[in-house]
Amino acid sequence: MAANSEGIVFHFLGTGGAQQVPAFGCECEICQQAQRDEKKRRRACCAAITTQDRIILIDAGLPELAPYLLPYPIRHILLTHYHMDHVQGLFPLRWGYGDPIPVFGPPDEAGCDDLFKHPGILHFQPPLTPFQPFELDGISITSVPLIHSKLTYGYLIQTPTHTLAYLTDTIGLPPETVQFLSAHTLDYAIVDCSHPPQTTPPRNHNDVTRALEIFTQLNPKQLYLTHIGHELDRWLQTQTLLPENVHAAYDGLVLGL
């Protein structure tokens, strides 16, 4: 999808979980396909918003970020949480050159490894307060609490023409987050969905059943699944049960904002 008149685009840089696709040592059909065809691979969950000649990075799951982001400079970074598969790209990035890069995210005294102690060009900002909007490059950003094993935020992202909710990693949504997001007309909801339907609720990440519950709760115009594992990919190849406006995102997909 092309950018809108404001030149704002949302990029899925990675749509996999920490395991990624292909999973190490796995010989299932999905992982074999991904080994042969780069288009079927899923790198660690990561996204970016490009605004003309600059980037707002959402998480840093890719160990080597530069090839995916050139030639645009990273102006800001939003972190959902400090699990390694969402921040590993910051470790080489911090020793780069150029202006300091403001980094926003939830409160977490431990952070990840020594990022806080040795931030390099990363400029970690005071922790965000849920439901308090702020602005980056003319885009309104509001953090919302999620449900995960580590304190995690999703983000409501509002441009002059579109509204998007980015909601990973999570298992369901807290009632206050549902109430807040339901008050907005969402063009897009990007929702964690790591597993095919489960008989009992999974831990930390949605399955298809819980992701579709979020679809019903928030009623977005379009919902995109992300943080997808190889088992869900296998299920998606054999099922046609997703509602018309629910899609599995893939690495490289872009949405106009």
Sequence positions of predicted segments:
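Cap/insert and terminal regions of metallo-dependent hydrolase folds
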Residues: G172-G256
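Binuclear metal-dependent hydrolase catalytic cores
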Residues: M1-E176, Y188, Q237-L257
